[in-house]
């Protein structure tokens, strides 16, 4: 499975009324300019996960990336 853009993930989320947004993993990844740096990368294929997208967040240590997923579980 590949990381897609947030817009594509939201379209998938709207097409499946029972889906929800959930963190894909617990890790934080260093921010590299824009989400395009992460779009297209391969991630582990997990049953029930429809899509994975990168989301920019910020804490006291600075900006980071959180991988979020659209799931059916």
Label every model-predicted segment:
Residues 1-2, 7-11, 70-73:
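Short intrinsically disordered terminal tails
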Residues 16-72:
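Acidic, low-complexity, intrinsically disordered interaction modules
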């Amino acid at each position: 499975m590949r990381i897609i853009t947030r817009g594509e993930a939201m379209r998938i989320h709207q097409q499946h009324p029972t889906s929800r947004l959930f963190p894909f993993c617990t890790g934080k990844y260093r921010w590299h300019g824009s989400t395009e740096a992460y779009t297209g990368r391969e991630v582990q294929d997990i049953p029930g996960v429809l899509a994975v997208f990168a989301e920019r967040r910020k804490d006291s240590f600075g900006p980071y990336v959180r991988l979020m997923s659209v799931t059916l579980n």
